[in-house]
Amino acid sequence: MKVTLIAILTCAAVLVLHTTAAEELEAESQLMEVGMPDTELAAVDEERLFECSVSCEIEKEGNKDYKKKKCKGGWKYKFNMCVKV
């Protein structure tokens, strides 16, 4: 009985792994077809470009010397504004 259960579970695991691998290969083959536009890849490239431009802007803005505002009466300067402490 235990051997049968182990065999069934093993077959199920192999089937799941095989199905997953087949889906990955099919997705890769669709991306590699010559006639198809690479919209998925273009979206990834666009996202990376956006991330790069944002990080570059942060680096540029980070080098500027900002004058901290003076906050009074129990207020503390944080996040470019006075916050109650």
From Swiss-Prot:
Propeptide: 23-48
SUPFAM superfamilies named among the record's database cross-references: omega toxin-like (SSF57059)
Keyword Transcription regulation assigned: no
Compartments where found: Secreted
A Pfam short name: Toxin_20
Keyword Transferase set for record: no
UniProt GO cellular component terms: extracellular region; host cell postsynaptic membrane
Tissue expr: Expressed by the venom gland.
UniProt xrefs under InterPro entries: Hwtx-2-like (IPR012625)
Alphabetized UniProt keyword annotations: Disulfide bond, Neurotoxin, Postsynaptic neurotoxin, Secreted, Signal, Toxin
Signal sequence, renumbered to the chain: 1-22
One Gene Ontology term of the molecular function aspect: toxin activity
Disulfide bonds: C71-C82
Family: Belongs to the neurotoxin 12 (Hwtx-2) family. 02 (Hwtx-2) subfamily.
Function: Postsynaptic neurotoxin.
Protein name stated in the entry: U4-theraphotoxin-Hhn1f
